[in-house]
Amino acid sequence: MVEEGAPGAGPADVWREARRRLARAGHDRYHVRHQVTGAAIPRDIAYFAMQVEFVAYTLLTIVPIPEDYREDHYWPSQPERN
């Protein structure tokens, strides 16, 4: 396996970064709550998750995957939550 951020990063590295960004936004907590109680995932978090997934799939179409795939300029801004 290639180290994160190293030249030649693979699909697993891109998905790891996507999951990290989703977790930082609290998506995991809302997703579990949705599964357990049926409560809807907040719209801004659901939209953010859709954007992150789109970016991850798009990065995977670039050959080779950019060395700086973890940089914020590729990814959507995290929603502001109170």
Q: What are the residue ranges of the model-derived segments?
A:
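A preference for well-ordered globular domain cores
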Residues: 1-82
